[in-house]
Structure formats: structure tokens, C-alpha cells
């Protein structure tokens, strides 16, 4: 029945009549607000309107606006009562989306790569500084220069995770390994702190050896690769011909 006023008449068996005026009040236009979407761990504010007295379910009560932090998708219902005692309800759904979690190494050398992964598929990767490191669509991080970079993995819901990666500089070698006569030596130098164990190595010690301070001693004709590794595990090479 729609809101308004009417008169109800009662007539008894003797033809006697009595009239009663009745007013029908409309229901309050209660609103719980629009449905909302949040990421796991976030809060959202619910604001109801449309009635003199408002009360939420789920243990919220008369608090309005109300801040809630659901751990899973939840429907909240608000009950509104107007000044005439008429009652109406409305609902709002708060969808809780899962936040991805990145895993993988936190260190990479310049010109080196590491692969990061997420526990949820379907997101996109991004680097906040391509001058320090780039990241591919599959999570492969390539070091560019020394520094720290934040790698972010974002879902279509907007939920994301950020992972900090440190890029270490690649050592720079100095010295000449071409045309060294047998019986002579050449000392290579490198930038950075040497690794604590075997910082200098030769790929073929029958051709040339190298000691812990970078002194290369040729032994026979041929080619070998001299490698220096720094304390961060980053390495550079030079060829002895």
C-alpha cells in the first residue's frame, strides 16, 4: 500500500456508521552506500543515511560512519527507523581481495639477472627505477647500475606487493694481458673489495696462473680467462692471449 491518508467506515447491522481516519507512512529511504572493494588488511568506512536512527549489524551497532576491517568478503546490513517508527533496511557488500606476495633473491649484480615470483598469477611487474634495474613481464630482474630499486607486482584489483632489490656494481678490471712473454708477469687490478676466498681465478692454469693479488704468470701459448670476483659475488673477466 502506498503512503497517504484514507478513511475507513464501518457500518453495523442497524445501519449505524463510524469513520476512522488512517495515515499510511512511507518507509524511510535507507541507504548503506555503494558496494566497496579493498585489499586484505585494509579498512573501509561505511556510511549509512536516510533515517533518524540507524544501526548496523555485524556487531557495529549505532556507530555511523563505521570503519570496518573484514578478513573476507562480507555483507553489512543497516536498519533505519524514522520518526514515525517505520523501519527499512539496506545492504552493502565489501569485497576483500587477496594481496600477492613476492619471493626471490634480494640481490643482483649489474648486468646479472634474478627471477622473482608471486604466489598469485595474473599480475604485472614494474620497476620504480629502470636506471638501476629493469623487470620483465615474467619477473626477471636485470641489474643496470649500483643502487636499490623497488619492484612492484600489481593485480587487476589494485592489490600489490613491493620488493626491494639491491644492485651491486660490476668490478672494473685494469691491466694488459696481451703479448706477455713467458717468464714475465702482469698485475691486474680491480675495483671493489675482493671476495674473501679465491678472488682471482684462471680458467686454464696450464696457460696462465693468477695469484690472490691479481698477478698473472704466463706458462704456455694459448688462451685463458682471468676472473675477478668481489665481496658481493659480482665478477668481471679478462682474456689472456
Residue spans for each PLM region:
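Conserved structural position at the C-terminal beta-strand
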Residues: 10-12, 80, 153-155, 228-230
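Extracellular acidic loop/turn motifs
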Residues: 53-55, 122-125, 192-199
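Short, solvent-exposed loop/linker segments at the N-terminal edge
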Residues: 36-42, 106-112, 177-184
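A short beta-strand segment in extracellular, disulfide-stabilized domains
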Residues: 42-50, 111-120, 184-192
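C-terminal edge beta-strand
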Residues: 18-25, 88-96, 161-167, 236-241
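Surface-exposed, flexible coil segments in extracellular/virion-facing regions
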Residues: 51-70, 127-140, 202-215
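Solvent-exposed segments in extracellular or luminal domains encompassing
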Residues: 1-7, 64-77, 138-148, 214-223
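Proline-enriched interdomain boundary motifs that mark the N-terminal boundary
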Residues: 27-35, 97-105, 133, 169-177, ...
